Amino acid sequence: MLRLYNGDCLKIMKDIKDKSVDFIYTDLPYATTQNSWDILIPLEPLWAEYNRILKDNGCVALWSQMPFSAQLVMSNPNDFRYEWIIEKTKGTGFLNAKRMPMKCHENVLIFYKKLPTYNPQKTIGHTPVHAFTKHSTDGTNYGKTHSVSGGGSTERYPRDVIQFKWDTQKSAVHPTQKPISAAEYFIKTYTNEGDTVLDSCMGSGSTGVACARLGRNFIGIEKDEKYFNISIDRFRAEGLSNKLPLVKFDNFADIIVLEADLRKQNDLQ
């Protein structure tokens, strides 16, 4: 299921059923620039809708950067759990480079009430650990024994500082576009196949593209008609049906909804 809305997320989310979403992954406006799209969404009503539509064991992952990170945490301190540090391949803030260090990371803040799905995305190819320990005590029942520790695994659990290849200025179609690889990483971490993901500020649709590739249902909301139309083109480029139906909701004149199965076009024929 692919459902796209063009309009105000606070209005549109009221039409989403209670406890129907497994994972909310979005890049809210930080309100740190003078751009028309960078306007802070009121956080209290936003959390009210998030909490209503999210399943009891659902998870919210929000992109942020200081000072917006602090605002987000303090807007819902009881549900905040931890942060991921996303290291950028290129720094930003060149105009202030002589006054302060350039910004080379953003945050993904994790919120939930009950322990959500967590599928750690292990990295592979590390050097195995084969440490031979002489006269170590494996257990008091057997006294001192010779043992091999480490098990030879080349896998490692994820750490909270990670890096993704960032879309360049030329390839990006949105000024704050985040890598599809990042969306795929967090979707695989916090959902299972067939789960429903919401992006309440989907921009050019990267989260939806990731959901299509991974077999997740997707609900996307974007207020800016320009980027909403770009997202439609990106979904079609992924091989989704070229006959996505357009539906007008009577209760929201400013909403356009598209629905389609998240299957490749050759599966639909």
Language-model-detected regions and their locations in the chain:
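Core catalytic lobe of class I
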Residues: 1-221, 226-230, 266-269
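S-adenosyl-L-methionine
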Residues: 1-13, 233-267
